[in-house]
A protein has these predicted regions:
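Aromatic-residue-lined binding/catalytic grooves and analogous aromatic/hydrophobic interfacial grooves
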Residues: 1-216
Length: 216
């Protein structure tokens, strides 16, 4: 296991930056590896506030040419003022987390021989440990051809119960549909940032509907 192609740890992650990453270029997941409750923090590369729009400011080319001429003339402050007032595009929107897949297992959190690892050759993340006679193992990976994150649960010398749930910080609802757990929701239509002062103010504007999303 202690091979250079593995990342491995002897305890679960306690914060997001310690979790193991998997992804396929579109879907991503961060795996914490707790014994009694596995959390996979999900994201999607297109889940942003706002909606498609042209961010190029009208007259920006002329403003750039004027600012460049002022800079070449040594008038740097005037050049900077024009860049800030007439050249810069609108503020970008906010990238959002999709939510959490939570797997709750039966039994206690007592364990031995715990290993949490990521195989850098196969991109498979795994969690394994012993609970009495049971040997528990989870394998997770993100498939690019199938566009899914897959979870495989294995138990040797026994059996187990698991409950799956989906959580999200956005406006959403979760329902069971055709054997699937489906989460659907809506992101804010705008995320405005006022960067003109030392203390930035943030507001959500929902005059237009934001992006709709579904996760199953």
């Amino acid at each position: 296991m202690k091979d250079s192609s593995f990342l491995w740890y002897d305890k679960p992650a306690s914060v997001w930056t310690q979790a193991l990453p998997i992804g396929n270029g579109t879907l991503g997941g961060m795996i914490y590896g707790k014994v009694e409750e596995e959390t996979v923090s999900l994201n999607h590369d297109e889940l942003w506030t706002g909606h498609p729009k042209n961010t190029i400011r009208p007259g920006s080319l002329e403003a750039f040419q004027k600012a460049r001429a002022l800079a070449l003339d040594g008038k740097l402050r005037e050049s900077q003022d024009i860049i800030e007032s007439d050249f810069m595009s609108t503020w970008s929107q906010a990238y959002l987390p999709l939510g959490d897949l939570v797997l709750t297992f039966d039994g206690s959190d007592r364990k031995s021989d715990y290993i949490r690892s990521l195989d850098l050759d196969t991109a498979i993340a795994s969690v394994s440990y012993r609970q009495g006679k049971r040997i528990m193992r989870r394998e997770l990976f993100a498939s690019h051809p199938d566009k899914v994150i897959a979870v495989r649960l294995i138990c040797e010398n026994g059996k187990f119960d698991v409950t799956a749930s989906l959580k999200c910080q956005l406006h959403h609802k979760v329902k069971s549909q055709s054997g699937l757990l489906v989460m659907s929701g809506e992101v804010p239509s705008e995320h405005n940032t006022n960067g003109q002062s030392d203390k930035q103010s943030y507001s959500k504007v929902d005059s237009e509907r934001g992006m709709l999303f579904t996760c199953a």
